[in-house]
Amino acid sequence: MTSAEAPDTPFEPKKILAQLPHMPGVYRYYDAAGAVLYVGKARDLKKRVSSYFTKTQLSPRIAMMVTRIARIETTVTRSEAEALLLENNLIKALAPRYNILFRDDKSYPYLKLTSHRFPRMAYYRGAVDKQNQYFGPFPSAWAVRESIQILQRVFQLRTCEDSVFNNRTRPCLLHQIGRCTAPCVGAISAEDYAVDVSNAARFLLGRQSEVMKELEQKMHAFAAELKFEQAAAVRNQMSSLATVLHQQAIEVGSDSDVDILAVVAQGGRVCVNLAMVRGGRHLGDKAYFPTHVESALTLAEGGLGDDTDADAVEAPDVPAEAPVGEPGSARDTTASIEAEVLDAFIAQHYLGNRVPPVLVVSHAPASRDLLELLSEQAGHKVSLVRQPQGQRRAWLSMAEQNAQIALARLLSEQGSQQARTRALAETLGLECDDLATLRIECFDISHTMGEATQASCVVYHHHKMQSGEYRRYNITGITPGDDYAAMRQVLTRRYEKMVEQAAQAAAADDAAGIDGESTRQAEASSLLPNIVLIDGGKGQVEIARQVFTELGLDTSMLVGVAKGEGRKVGLETLVFADGRAPLELGKESAALMLVAQIRDEAHRFAITGMRAKRAKARQTSRLEELEGVGAKRRQRLLARFGGLRGVVAASVEELASVDGISHALAEQIYKQLH
């Protein structure tokens, strides 16, 4: 059930507060523009929402937020647990300004064992299914690949694609170096391979002692039967496993699956360090930095009612510094902040995802309902350990240290980036009241001998690269290798729409009797960057100047980055389109460091896109030209033979064995490819 204050009537809190029930649910605050300010949950909606409007000693910041509330929506739920789940979903979907937000990282890597007769071991990201076996999640791709290398060395499981496996005629190099038992050519039976797969799975689950004991029994059995070669092979396998266990003795504990969560607040930012233990092995950690922290943490500044502890993401402001003090001091405030951030992380990270049976945490969670909901969702009891002992205590201490290191690194990088942004603005003579609003776009053209030409546009805003705003442009209709034409095309496509939108807004304002010129300027400034970097010299900048002149844009924002002698970093020259003399900044210039950083990112983004486009064209172009072969048949051919090279090497009989391809069509395909 949802209730809301009508947006077209003056906001009267008393009216809607009187209608709120004494029931659990979720509430949402909106401003006059319809933007969501905050999403919260409550065990008693009437009591919780009323506290924002009935308390008289609110802090100035909370009072300011309350004055911005133009509409309230509430949703009644059947239980507090249901309210918590709905709150978490709404926070992820709406990203309110005053809620703590963590990046929604759904694609944690897993180690996958496929359901093939000879299962393949593979690195995997994405949704899990019941058909295959999945181990993880792992904190990083490196942790997965390290585990794969260990399993290759000890159990020699295959890692090749099924299409390659089905077409092998002799063992690959991995078999020759003792990293695969070559099931592709029948060098091992399905039964023996299944034993290796089972041992590998138990190893990943932390049951290494069972595996070692069974291998020892197997070795003695072979020796008793005078099968000394087989006994020696098992002995070597035991030796490899013992070596791995010895190398990882420091990180192996009695726990099977545990997550360690440490939170540190400092310098106005918060870091959550998540360390993962799977199968008793410490797999590494990952640092998370929530956004909207300062805004979100203002909401509990004034102690909003007796129901405050029911809301999982409310806490006081993050202070710039947190010195040691008496109870109620900045140190206590920081501890409260860290606990609330931990609640937000647990809710956003684990609800809807796999949860290990044990969470070792640096702070006691504020929400009492969260643990019950996690246990219900996981299908097993989830325990939170606040004061661990032994190995768990060492893991938590290490996680806290890593959180402090990651946070210090972030703050240092932020300070460095802000200094670079300021230096560039001063160098170019830009007047910018808030450097965080300075927007820089950079363009680069990439191709190989005129093939697969692509242009890239990267964006620098709020003192960092904004990868979500990057764009690639496929360049068509030009002479291959003509970088000038490519630059003209991408700049026209990029900014022509922005100019049209500004003109439409100005026309609408004129029709409404508003000063069209001032509105148009405001519209253009919100759409266009402050600086446009062009990876190139005078020729590229001249093309950019022509495009901007045709579009009626200010050419003073155009800056070319010409490479220096020998293309050495630090010798670049800035070239301007408005007649200013070229500028050489020197290797130690903070402004040049920022320009080079943005330029290099544009080049990287263009190169990766160009390579992918070129590889796709080379792999599929000949198959797409085959008569009688559509998309489905082409996919079957690629799946059967592993790629274009395999299709070309196939005989007529092999082609005809593919589902949907007759013998006559196979002959036709063979003739077209040879």
Curated annotation (Swiss-Prot):
It is found in: Cytoplasm. Keywords: Cytoplasm, DNA damage, DNA excision, DNA repair, Excision nuclease, SOS response. One of its GO terms (cellular component) is excinuclease repair complex. The keyword DNA damage applies. Its main location: cytoplasm. The keyword Repeat does not apply. InterPro entries: GIY-YIG_endonuc, GIY-YIG_endonuc_sf, GIY-YIG_UvrC_Cho, Hlx-hairpin-Hlx_DNA-bd_motif, RuvA_2-like, UVR_dom, UVR_dom_sf, UvrABC_protein_C. One of its GO terms (molecular function) is excinuclease ABC activity. One of its GO terms (biological process) is nucleotide-excision repair. Belongs to the UvrC family. Interacts with UvrB in an incision complex. This is UvrABC system protein C. It comes from Burkholderia multivorans (strain ATCC 17616 / 249).
